[in-house]
Design a protein with these regions (language model features):
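Internal helical hairpin/lid segments
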Residues: 125-193
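Phosphate-moiety recognition in structured ligand-binding domains
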Residues: 45, 181-248
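Short glycine-rich or small-residue beta-strand-to-loop segments that form or flank ligand, phosphate
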Residues: 2-7, 114-121, 164-168
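Short, ordered loop/turn segments at secondary-structure junctions
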Residues: 35-37, 148, 197-200
């Protein structure tokens, strides 16, 4: 059994307790990604990488390697040869291209009473965490995240002309689910945004590998949105009301 953890501080009590229990009772191999250079979770890890930010990239690089070792990712070596050579610069260029859009998005949505985020496939985890961990936790803005396939199972009945809705569209097998939402939403709403990874060039990356990177493109776009949301809200994303301030 392998357990992969990611932590900024490396000392979150609940995670520390969980890893101690896992190592004592199961004997799992632990891979620790921790932003801090020294931390308890680094000490508990069998394999450890101390490097800040880019959690998604770290996780997917490890997951891809596991799949390759298990014979489930035939193009791994060719794909990662391209990623190693081109991906870093390509994602920087995504952020540059997204900048004007991010400015306008933040100006439009910084004071939303409620914002809905929709995504599917390898975009879904990022959609869920962006709504909860960024807008709710870090910006104190109310959100709801929903999968594209569930959009038509209730949620669309509360969408009106003014409802803020952002739809993320990736390039994997579940793209049609998000396209369906994007094609429908203009009929009922005038306050929607579509963020499609296909709109962003990834220079040097083969078309067949883009599906593996949709969520990284989304993260790059969101990085720029976050910068301008901080400016518009006058709210630094580092501050918290309750986390590490109150016992719970």
């Amino acid at each position: 059994t392998v357990v992969i953890i990611s932590s900024v501080t490396g000392n979150t009590k609940e995670v520390v307790d969980a890893i101690k229990k896992i190592k004592a009772e199961v004997g799992s191999t632990v891979i620790s990604f921790v932003d801090a250079k020294e931390a308890i979770l680094l000490d508990l890890g069998d394999y450890k990488i101390s490097y800040p930010v880019n959690e998604q990239l770290k996780f997917f690089m490890v997951a891809d390697r596991f799949m390759f070792n298990n014979g489930e990712l035939e193009d791994y070596e060719d794909m990662y040869a391209e990623f190693d050579k081109y991906l870093a610069e390509a994602l920087v260029e995504v952020e540059k291209k997204a900048e004007p859009f991010a400015v306008e998005f933040a100006k439009k949505h910084w004071n939303d009473e409620m914002h809905y985020f929709v995504g599917a496939g390898n975009q879904w985890g990022a959609t869920y965490s962006y709504a909860m961990c960024y807008w709710e936790e870090q910006l104190w803005l109310k959100t709801k995240s929903i999968t594209s396939n569930e959009f038509f199972h209730g949620m669309f009945e509360i969408v009106t002309k003014e409802t803020p809705v952002t739809i993320y569209i990736g390039e994997d097998a579940q793209r049609p689910l998000s396209e369906r939402v994007a094609n429908f939403i203009p009929r009922i709403c005038e306050n929607y945004t579509i963020i499609d990874s296909k709109d962003y060039e990834l220079k040097g990356i083969s078309e067949k590998y883009r599906k593996h990177l949709s969520h990284h493109v989304m993260h790059a776009v969101n990085n720029r949105i976050d910068v301008h949301m901080e400016i518009e809200t006058r709210h630094p994303m580092e501050i918290r009301r309750y986390y590490r301030r109150l016992e719970y």
